[in-house]
Amino acid sequence: MKKGTLTLFLLLAISIPLCAQYVVQGVVTDSLTKEPLPYASVRLKDTTEGTTTGSDGRFYFKTHRSEAVLVISVIGYNDYVRTIRPARNASYKVALAPTEYALGEVVVKPKREHYRKKDNPAVEFVRRMIESRDNYSPYEKDFWQRERYEKTTFALNNFDEEKQKKWLYRKFDFLTEYVDTSAVTGKPILTVSARELLATDYYRKSPRSEKQWVKGRKQAGVDEFLSKQGMQAAINEVFKDVDIYENNISLFTNKFVSPLSRIGTGFYKYYLMDTLQIAGEPCADLAFTPFNSESFGFNGHLYVTLDSTYFVKRAVFNFPKKINLNFVDYMLLEQEFKRAEDGTRLLDHEIITVEFKLTEGQDGIFARRVADYSNYTFTPTAEADKAFTKPERIIEETEALSRPETFWAENRPQAAISQQENSVDRLMTQLRSYPVYYWTEKVLSILFTGYIPTSKEAPLFYIGPMNATISGNTLEGPRIRAGGMTTAWLNPHLFGKGYVAYGFKDERVKGLAELEYSFKKKKEYANEFPIHSLKLRYESDVNQYGQNYLYTSKDNVFLALKREKDDRIGYFRQAEMTYTNEFYSGFSFQLTARTRKDESSYLIPFLKKEGDTYTPVKDFSISAAELKLRYASNEKFFQTQWTRFPVSLDAPVFTLSHTIAGKGVLGSDYTYNHTEAGIQKRFWFSAFGYTDVILKAGKVWDKVPFPLLIMPNANLSYTIQPESYSLMNAMEFMNDEYFSWDVTYFLNGWLFNRVPLLKKLKWREIVSCRGLYGHLSDKNNPALSDGLFAFPIENTQTMGKTPYVEAGVGIENIFKVLRLDYIWRLTYRDSPGIDRSGLRISLHMTF
């Protein structure tokens, strides 16, 4: 398969064609300009059947009706109304004429629209809806439960005969057996991944809790080489359950302003379009569109009952054509609601349809997620009581992943059955029998994970990470490294990890050996959440003073290019035992017993100062105990082989740690106490972007040599690294207490979207500020106190009353993947050997 297509597929999506007897399809254009009209409403009158046009103006849906009235409408154009006979399977070419029409006191024009909120009946209608949006909310009930069936599929889009004849696909002539037809676009598609879920959802108001009991989960497709848990967490985060009554709707890791938001009337234009019957009830067709089509909002329709409840029977959302959103070429969200006997609104059916494209000109990925909800109950059950006693939010039955096909045949809704979709596992078996696909999958696995599996399925051992194989520095010269780790397929409780490295200049072997016992049975990797383990670890390697890359390996080849000489390096040897316990509540703690020996080098000598005498010291030891506390409520991860990345930063993360060592205890040369605390939080500003804030503070309480002091984290590379300083030199400052901040504001194009030229580029603005206020007490300053190691770097300094501050402005979304920041150093600008400003770069792929 095409590398680009597979890359895009890994950005996640979903699909599920529905079957019907007759096809209604065609294209809608502007009668004057002949240009296609995207997002026009296409429906059969007095029914809920229909769709909206895609970005190319085309529409496609199926119906069982042999005769119906087709209505096509879009803001600023005359409606198209015609009796059709779908049984003829005709294709309709509809040219809509622009018009000027009245909505009460509101006048709408096709080109220059003079929209007014004052005295606009649609705006007043929406205000009343917003005021009553919590009425009949299911979340006002004390309890409810429901059954959920969910199907998520990915498919190669527009897999027509022309594409099938290309050399890449001619090798796999059997693919034609699996081609299906999209019920939305009418294009042929090839489903390459399918996921199914059968579960029961539980909700309790007080104390507030939501649980999901998974009875069955099924997965097959080209993404099998990735972590199953990681992919599922990422998909769940990208395609979150949508509540249109919230102020913001979370999709594609972003937040979009809901048409029923408290700020909705300032963000959207609203129009009362028509009155129609939906499920036997007269409903107003309320259309909406953002004032600024590049902003993070929706076009769409809400079909609202004409009574005092303002009940939404059906919702249809899509993205404006010009929205500043990456990789999503088309999105359609459809929700249908029903009422309980007491009027409570219940979500009955939901479909999210997406067309993903990595670049223009590609057919990309067709994706769809369908969710059916049934059997709502408002009386607590024994099963619910059992679920609420479980600590995890998602409870998965032991046999959930191994359900037989008979289970799915019995529980799968009839509408979700598609022979092509449900045979993805058979498709994958045939694909992997071809060497060209087998090796392509292997290469992609290495590129995306950084590791080489030692077997085709359920690998016992991974070799890697490959991006750390070659690196170098001033002390070691060229450095090579090889390593790997075991998996749960070898032993679900016992895990090993390690590497061996060699420097050709210092001719020394370094390495790491780690053995971890997990008290919980793991499915794939040792670091799966939640961790409850005991770990033994020994490491002997170089110590790059003042550099601590928190989000990547120090051996990452992409960090090899430095803005200054990397010569603040010594050696260390460390043995430790760590007990870790993570809880589903988000709280975790870690206890570590550690003995460490730091060794000097010709670059970083240890010279002990006594008056005017400096005595060389080869090394020193510290034996310490450490306690770390962490709380991150509702944190979700994308799981990889070697680490896990949070996929949601909405909830705050609190950390607190303390390290203690006593002189003479287990060979420790010093008494050492070090305390650190931190908080991290993402703040969303609806249409105005979001801000990531990281605050930290720490203190060393005792008299210790400089390797045990607090050295701000200097980033010597030209890449953008969080929680590090792009223009600070390594070991430039020494502190025994500090307070730091890292604030980055992502505007999501809020300003650029208003500049005609820039909004076409879809660039997005970034403003950042990082700083640190530190202090070094006299007892830890070798210039004022004897018995300490002299600072080995001539330019090392202590801070006065002025904090170190650097600020930057940047542009992200350059070619959809690049971020460029220009950074200024605002303080300590006259220090010798420093950069006052500089350009930094990173790869940053985001929706």
Feature-to-residue mapping (PLM):
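Structured extracytoplasmic
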Residues: 101, 107, 111-283, 289-297, ...
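Short, acidic Ser/Thr/Gly-rich low-complexity loop/linker segments typical of extracellular
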Residues: 48-58
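A short, amphipathic beta-strand motif
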Residues: 24-30, 57, 94
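Short, ordered, surface-exposed loop/turn motifs in non-cytosolic proteins
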Residues: 22-24, 31-46, 65
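Extracellular beta-sheet/turn segments enriched in Thr/Pro/Gly and aliphatic residues
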Residues: 85-111
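Bacterial Sec-dependent N-terminal signal peptides
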Residues: 1-27, 42, 101-110, 526, ...
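Exposed, low-structure sequence patches enriched in small/polar residues
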Residues: 250, 254-256, 388-847
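A short, solvent-exposed loop/turn motif at the edges and junctions
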Residues: 44-46, 71-82
